Amino acid sequence: MAQEIFSIAAVFWILIPIGLVGGALLLKFQGD
C-alpha cells in the first residue's frame, strides 16, 4: 500500500512541473 502511494506521489512530482512549464510555454508562444 505504502509503495503504491509513493509511486503515485512520484508521478505527480514529475508531471506537475512538466505541466506548469508546458502551460507557461504555450501561453508565451500564443502571446507572440
UniProtKB/Swiss-Prot annotation:
InterPro entries: PetM_cyt_b6/f_cplx_su7. It is a single-pass membrane protein. GO terms for molecular function: electron transfer activity. The chain crosses the membrane at residues 9-27. It is found in: Cellular thylakoid membrane. Its main location: membrane. One of its GO terms (biological process) is photosynthesis. It comes from the Bacteria. It holds the Pfam family PetM. Belongs to the PetM family. NCBIfam families: PRK11876.1-2 (NF008826). The 4 large subunits of the cytochrome b6-f complex are cytochrome b6, subunit IV (17 kDa polypeptide, PetD), cytochrome f and the Rieske protein, while the 4 small subunits are PetG, PetL, PetM and PetN. The complex functions as a dimer. This is Cytochrome b6-f complex subunit 7. It comes from Prochlorococcus marinus (strain MIT 9301). The lineage of its organism: Bacteria, Bacillati, Cyanobacteriota, Cyanophyceae, Synechococcales. The gene is petM.
